[in-house]
């Protein structure tokens, strides 16, 4: 806000607008108070053990109401308290909140904010707004606050570290020749320790001359050059090892936000598949309300189902049906659902292409061959047996895939060109398959093919994808304004609570509170007459 009295001797007048009149609450404010007024805020504490000046309930109202109005930064929230009538009524006229107070509240109460989110979901259930039968999951990638070109790649760091160790070994040999270090062959496996000792010996003996002239026409002494290069290489090695320790199973990170991972985004401003530092956000939705959320560094969605299901386990009720798109079609997702006795309505990866005639008539696919469970082999169209030959591991699946091969009869087969795609280079038919995964895929395909399965698929697109669209378009949340996974997740949970509040406000205006949302597909006239 501009300061209009900065260069003026006559100061601007201040008027007190807190007159004696009442303002009717909007539906958003009614929904906000309904959801968060009687929750348990005892988990919020202070570092010094004394009661804070501002109640956590009021601070949560500020965060959520600010997010509903597109204000997420601490300075914007500070101005929001001063300018908004509802916030004036919540905090009073004599309370001033500094932006640092808001920032500290978010940083120190990350677990408590997640607990308030869980309590608000239970409050929605008590209002009759949740169906408690079907849960939908989907994910998105949201860009981090980190710079786009602050990448650190794991493979490049490992190569540079090997080169750095080689240079350190060379410097260590120079130190040994100058009688500054005494080493054996075993010391060259970890050369940084004896080289650091050599640098300390140079400093202790006073051999380093920091006032030595530099520039054109001046040559550094051997000791000065050795020490400067050693300090430089040791600092590089320390930084490279620090980066590798922070990878934690990832292949990249950002220097300015080490929790962010570089991913390929749909919002590509250069239209060339550029990688950006981002977080993988997952939402679980029931009746158009976000009931659980998680954050991870996974670049794909197939390993994130377990995180959401663990969050759903904390709710006092259990879901019987789980629905997700083909990005979650993996054996781990099915196994996690079977542990919890949840029916899996996961769209198979070949759902769309399986409807085509060419896919169903492809004789080279394992699904179109006959499997003999007794002999553990497949029978192709020519009647030849493809027997088990071994296992093959992959990054995507925790369990290895089974490899089947046909060792005779493929060269002279009349169907060779249709069965083997690369028939000019490959002599025999060979494919990989996960029988357990394939069996679960068939069950999910049958469930989704029913009339109820069609409704579940339609509701998945409407509900969970609609919530992401609302958060990105209505709230403008396309890039986080905080650093670190914990702080970013707190910011996201506040946005989720604001989304649920806006949805409840719309339901209050429509007079539909107590009837969970479910889109039903209208029957065709032929089905109605039948």
Residue ranges: model-predicted function:
Residues 1-4, 35-37, 256:
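Intrinsic disorder/low-complexity signature
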Residues 88-92:
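Short arginine-rich
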Residues 5-6, 70-82, 93-530:
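Anion-binding and metal-coordination hotspots
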Residues 22-64, 69:
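Basic, short loop/linker segments at the boundary and entry of helix-turn-helix/winged-helix-like folds
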Residues 18-22, 35-36, 40, 153, ...:
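Short, solvent-exposed coil/turn linker segments
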Residues 1-30:
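Hydrophobic alpha-helical membrane-insertion signals
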Residues 85:
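An anion-engaging/catalytic patch
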